[in-house]
Amino acid sequence: LHNQFYAMGQEVLSQINRTVRAFVTHDRDLAKEVIEQDAEVNEYELKLEKKSFEIIALQQPVSQDLRTVLTVLKAVSDLERMGDHAVSIAEATIRMKGEQRIPAVEEEIKKMGRDVKDFVETTLELYLNGSVDKAYEVATMDEKINHYFENIRDLATEEIRKNPDAIVTGRDYFQVISYLERIGDYAKNICEWVVYFETGKIVEL
């Protein structure tokens, strides 16, 4: 289960990486590939859910084994939602064809996307090899993502004030940073599931 989960995580990580790149380079073809890639992520989710339910039904796991299955089920759901948000960013990339862009905002979105990708990557490593202390430490990366969200929102608002023609573009920027911020939230959720796996306690980090 853990290995399949990690493989699904790598697929989602690729989606996040490619969707941010597509958005800031205005690459609609790459955005379409991200959307197509979502079918693979959904396939992973279905396989992992099926395997988990089979283990519960056939083996009737207790204690640590049951926690393993429950952790996978919850974390898989978080990964799948990350993939959905990557698709939403790709759809925004396609929708923005011909719209006026704001380079300063896109540069910050690029940085935010890079740090979101790093957060997800670190979370996946934590899932395979982590500890409770490490989970608490990794979860703090979400604060940086939240700061990006606030700063880019303020920057975009200021730029639109100076150039009202960019208001449609601004709406898409707000959506994209919102999707990235939510991906960060789901990464933090996985940190919480690591704590549950190790201790049996449900916590909010």
Each model region followed by its residue ranges:
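Cytosolic, long alpha-helical scaffolding segments
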Residues: 1-205
